């Protein structure tokens, strides 16, 4: 497993959800290894404070901040445009941002917010940045899923959960979908020098519900996670491992727990479902149905 002595000098890494929790710990770890870290956050004031903190703690000035609302497809497209205006390479993309919403809400695009942020945002951002990721090969795409995917199931006729909404059902579905997306992406990227893997970070004691509903809902979610959760630093270890370790050079289409490849839920290996979900995701974000 890489240590903080592992050099990421010259590598450009983009981390979503980088202003708190696992994302913040991941961004700090990569900065300490010498990477150029591009943080993605939603709030400028908070983002700039975390940016300064990471620069100070890491001694690395190459820490950038881009702002985006990952529940908005327009904002995601602007994020990709902003990145491509500043950078010509992207060696590591970590789709870390995620949320739980205790009640059903729709985004500005009319989509259920958990599915939109936890799956469609990574799907859209990855595809928008894919050309520069390929041009930077060997490069890595890392999707932060959850063991909760094992309790999830997907009804392709009701991905937006319009029939009956339960927040754990919505979360499990979104994280299951993220594993399916990862495996389909890995297959489509074979031979390009780009790998795609996903992971369970552990149940992390952090402000996970920050993008959920109101303060009471956030408090409930945070209480659940903080009562038995690990630290964000511990939770970031597998993301950092997949981003930096020579041990996983060329390894793709895998699900990792504690930096070890594990079997994901049986349904995630259904290639027909992987393709079907890809095509529906492409339709929902208005992308051509190809890499």
Language-model features, listed with the residues they occupy:
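Hydrophobic alpha-helix feature that most strongly marks membrane-spanning transmembrane helices
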Residues: 190, 213, 244-247
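A short small-residue
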Residues: 31, 218, 260-264
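Rossmann-fold NAD(P)H-dependent dehydrogenase/reductase core
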Residues: 1-208, 286-291
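A glycine/serine/threonine-rich, flexible loop-to-helix segment
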Residues: 159, 205-223
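A short, mixed-charge helix-start or loop-turn motif at secondary-structure junctions
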Residues: 16, 163, 167, 221-225, ...
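C-terminal helical subdomain
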Residues: 174, 198, 222-263, 269-275, ...
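Short glycine/threonine-rich loop-to-helix capping motif typified by GTGT followed
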Residues: 210, 267-268
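A non-catalytic, amphipathic alpha-helix used as a structural packing/dimerization or gating element
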Residues: 46-49, 276, 280
